[in-house]
Amino acid sequence: MFYKIAQSIMFQMDPERAHNLAIGSLKRTANTPMTAFYAQCIAPKPVTCMGIIFPNPVGLAAGLDKDGEAIDAFHAMGFGHVEVGTVTPRPQPGNDLPRLFRLKPAKGIINRMGFNNKGVDNLVANLKAKKTDILVGVNIGKNKDTPVEEGKNDYLICMDKVYPHAAYIAVNISSPNTPGLRTLQYGDLLDDLLSSLKAKQTELAEQHGKYVPIALKIAPDLTDEEIASIATSLIKNQFDAAIATNTTLSRDGVSGLANANETGGLSGKPLTELSTKVIKKLAAELKGEIPIIGVGGINSSQDALAKFDAGATLVQIYSGFIYQGPKLIKDIVASYSAK
């Protein structure tokens, strides 16, 4: 009830202003009696993925809390994990405004944010400051002004800094809003990046005395051959998980709607079937050797179950969470527990 009232107010506002207001409010109310407005008790349904025991299979996808400012508030809502980021070595403003658009009739969102964030050092400070024990994955990327061929160094810098504080690390090479980034998903560039990250993980595990898994986040706009090639590279380089998928450049199902022609990645309900299809294909290629975290267009518990059936071990929500509120977490966990 409270969420529906808050949503009706937020949906009258500019999307990015509403987003910033929401994160600010959650940051201020976390670990105070005010959490009563959004906290909920969810019966545990533990799931093991990447060698980690998650309290339930529903996580918050990267992009909502880029700088890790409201982690404890999302814990109160019952998320099994939170993925913060995408974070880059240096702070950057992202793309010009406006850059976030609602497609309300389709329950979709288009964004061209461009990895706006306050930098990895700021994120690390926020990770150190969190008061709950929620599992936090950190999604890392490259700065816009770093040439693609030197992008690997940005990932290694971020990995080095977040490693002691992360439950797992997600490598984002699939955002459509950083020029050239998606080229890292192919061929020798991908193999070189993954092998370098794996070597860095081995070095950091020894240095810190703990193993932090690494996952690769991929795009939905891939051919079957490209998915097969990525799967081969993930297995070869002994990655710990794949996250499928990021936003799509496709506009299937939204043509003619207001904002549909805006540049950027489309998320939400229009992405549901495409991301599930990619998960199914990826699962067939990985053959159970590497787990998949399913994300993209989960707007109901049925959508989440379809992701699990396609081969996902965990799921994450973002756009569906904006449209449905915290109740979606509870619904998915209940349906998962009953299956």
Curated annotation (Swiss-Prot):
FMN binds at residues 62-66, 86, 139, 172, 217, 245, 268, 297, 318-319. One of its GO terms (biological process) is 'de novo' pyrimidine nucleobase biosynthetic process. Pathway: Pyrimidine metabolism; UMP biosynthesis via de novo pathway; orotate from (S)-dihydroorotate (quinone route): step 1/1. Pfam families: DHO_dh. Binds 1 FMN per subunit. InterPro entries: Aldolase_TIM, DHO_dehydrogenase, Dihydroorotate_DH_1_2, Dihydroorotate_DH_2, Dihydroorotate_DH_cat, Dihydroorotate_DH_CS. GO terms for cellular component: cytoplasm; plasma membrane. PANTHER family: DIHYDROOROTATE DEHYDROGENASE (QUINONE), MITOCHONDRIAL, DIHYDROOROTATE DEHYDROGENASE (QUINONE), MITOCHONDRIAL-RELATED. Belongs to the dihydroorotate dehydrogenase family. Type 2 subfamily. This is Dihydroorotate dehydrogenase (quinone). It comes from Shewanella amazonensis (strain ATCC BAA-1098 / SB2B). The gene is pyrD.
